[in-house]
A protein has these predicted regions:
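Active-site neighborhoods of enzymes that stabilize oxyanions during catalysis
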Residues: 219-371, 380
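Repeated loop/turn-to-beta-strand initiation elements of outer-membrane beta-barrel proteins
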Residues: 424-430, 452-461, 483-491, 499, ...
Length: 527
């Protein structure tokens, strides 16, 4: 635990501890193939005998903003708000652009985990490993932590399957080292939000814009929003016939979803909490060849029957999403041989309802969560319903108080700083100088507020009064802290030019040695 933590100050510090790791874009078929090939020795060692659930199914649409923003509350796909990246008004009262959706998704996360989004980009990906290891020191401040591993997703989109698999294997290496350092009483859950489809890249947005500009208001794969007065059935059929999309569904009436695939017409009929599937033409899902007899089934029955097929529980997923007031009038999907090619997703993508998109692993270990690995099946949106004993988004009651002292050999002065934290994210302090150890002068008083915190860094802004000059003056300050386990680097910039750069090393939970401006040596005691 770092000396900057607020150890013991969290009202939930006696609650069970949990690290919840969101492993982006790894489906069960990929994970199982990598385990069987011997490429995931740590996952196999830690989870394969018990604790690896391979029969979980995620949301449709299998898109990151929809899943992240809804899963914590156990929200179903029929009611979740953030259904895609680009959304017309509906329940929001205004259109949501890609930038709006990204911000809403980021703000739905635990505060210290939001920077994981940037760390998933190739340019910043080197910080991801450091951030993960830093979570080991944050459990006293945050008994329940969330961590988002985006590397596989980002590299799958940008670089393709080979680099994607390298990042999946890299996760195995990193998680092995991490769990070996994790205390046995700390629970861990690793879940994936969706898979990643490679193959032929097809530019669906260009196809829709070129051929359906008169009918379609917005297309954000897999959802299609139509202009007023456009016939849904005619458009859905044309979409399948005139684009690379394989499936298109719409609500024929309140109880029936109708769709098209090549020369087949497909129906999902709802009655008394159950759904029946029927088709005119070939069965693209192969349900009737695998034990289905045309009866009405519950959602769980559909999942049990189809979890090992190419299109698991598709009737449930499509019908549920079409009930969502923010969904488009038509919902679509590619098969697992093609992906939607965009500016961001040049080499791979996801979002549809194939097994490669939606069958995801859940890995668990720990005294309070181990039983989840024994489930026969799991709808991913129900995962958080199993975690009622954990409190998410809790924060410390306050930050640490501290006293620091350092001797500056260039000026022969000793400076002592006393800081008090009345509440979390606030600190008040005073700097006192002792010249030649004879007498004391109040140098400055200050207050600061934490505006950014991640697993790696913290940024404070504040102000105060400088008494060291002939004329007392006010000052503004910005302070940045960067931490890697026991080592930290701190930069303080002030308008009174009392700028500082400090390197620190924690030799105990509450005690660190410091070097400031490469001329002053001292210590810091946290309380």
């Amino acid at each position: 635990m770092g000396a900057n933590s607020a150890a013991g100050q969290n009202s939930g510090s006696d609650s069970p501890k949990l690290i919840l790791i969101h492993l982006d874009a790894v489906s069960v078929p990929v994970l199982r193939a990598e385990i069987d090939a011997g490429n995931m020795p740590n996952i196999k060692r830690i989870f394969n005998e018990e604790g690896l659930l391979e029969t979980a199914i995620t949301y449709y649409p299998s898109k990151t903003p929809f899943i992240i923003s809804n899963i914590r509350d156990g929200t179903s796909s029929s009611t979740g708000e953030l259904v895609g990246w680009d959304i017309p008004g509906f329940d929001y009262g205004k259109d949501l652009s890609i930038e709006d959706s990204f911000l809403k998704m980021a703000l739905s996360k635990q505060r210290i985990s939001r920077a994981n989004l940037l760390q998933g980009l190739p340019f910043f990906s080197g910080l991801k490993d450091l951030a993960l290891m830093n979570t080991l020191d944050l459990f006293d401040d945050y008994p329940v932590q969330e961590f988002y591993w985006y590397k596989a997703d980002s590299y799958g989109h940008f670089e393709g399957e080979e680099e994607y698999l390298r990042k999946v294997r890299q996760f195995d290496e990193r998680i092995g080292k991490y769990i070996d350092k994790l205390d046995d009483d700390i629970n861990i859950i690793i879940y994936s939000d969706h898979g990643m489809v490679f193959g032929e890249g097809v530019e669906l947005n260009k196809q829709i814009n070129n051929r359906f500009s008169d009918e379609v208001k917005v297309y954000s794969y897999p959802t299609m929003y139509l202009k007023e007065g456009v016939d849904e059935e005619t458009t859905a059929k044309r979409v399948v016939n005139e684009t690379d999309l394989d499936f298109a569904f719409f609500l024929q009436d309140r109880m029936t979803a109708k769709g098209f695939f090549e020369n087949s017409t497909l129906y999902f009929e709802y009655q008394d909490g159950k759904i029946r599937y029927r088709h005119d033409g070939p069965d693209p899902f192969d349900y009737f060849d695998n034990g289905y007899n045309g009866e009405f089934l519950t959602a769980d029955e559909w999942l049990s029957l189809t979890i090992e097929l190419d299109y698991p529980a598709t009737p449930v997923k499509v019908f549920a999403f079409l009930q969502n007031p923010n969904a488009g009038e038509i919902v679509t999907s590619l098969d697992n041989t093609k992906f939607n090619k965009t500016g961001y997703s040049q080499m791979g993508n996801h979002g549809g309802f194939t097994a490669t998109d939606v069958v995801v692993p859940v890995m668990v270990r720990g005294p309070d969560v181990g039983y989840i690995g024994e489930f026969d099946k799991l709808w991913l949106q129900e995962l958080f319903n199993e975690l009622d004993q954990f409190t998410f988004k809790q924060e410390p009651n306050r930050d640490t108080h501290y006293i620091s002292s350092r001797y500056d050999f260039s000026t022969n002065t000793n400076r002592t700083v006393a800081a008090y934290s009345p509440a979390y994210r606030f600190r008040l302090g005073a700097d006192i100088d002792f010249g030649d150890f004879n007498g004391a002068d109040l140098n400055q008083v200050w207050g600061k507020y934490d505006i950014v915190r991640s697993q790696l860094a913290r940024v404070w802004i504040g102000g105060g009064v400088d008494f060291s000059r002939t004329d007392t003056v006010g000052m503004f300050m910005v302070r940045h802290e960067f931490r890697i386990r026991n080592f930290s680097a701190k930069t303080s910039i002030t308008t009174n030019k009392n700028n500082q750069f400090t390197l620190a090393y924690d030799i105990h939970d509450n005690f660190s040695l410091e070097l400031t401006n490469f001329s002053a040596v001292g210590f810091r005691l946290s309380l």
